[in-house]
């Protein structure tokens, strides 16, 4: 049997505090460390905010969240 390695899956979603709902989660990349995953989640969050734009964010009170989920790989 192969050795099991822990990796981290970056999962992001866009939510609206105005409407109280979120779009479906989007799985992104796999990372070897928590640091790499959380850093990329922050970078992706800022990029998503820039893409959506100030007007869209303000109108719908949008915010972007992310989490790093631990996964076992072989």
Region spans (language model):
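Short, well-ordered alpha-helical segments
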Residues: 33-45
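Short, intrinsically disordered, charge-biased short linear motifs at domain edges
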Residues: 6, 22-26, 52-58
């Amino acid at each position: 049997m192969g050795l099991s390695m822990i990796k981290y899956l970056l999962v992001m979603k866009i939510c609206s505090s105005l409407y109280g709902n979120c779009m479906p989660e989007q799985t992104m990349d796999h990372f070897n460390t928590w640091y790499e995953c959380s850093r990329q989640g922050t970078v992706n969050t800022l990029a998503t905010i820039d893409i959506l734009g100030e007007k869209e964010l303000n109108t719908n009170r949008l915010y972007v969240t992310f989490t790093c989920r631990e996964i076992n790989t072989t």
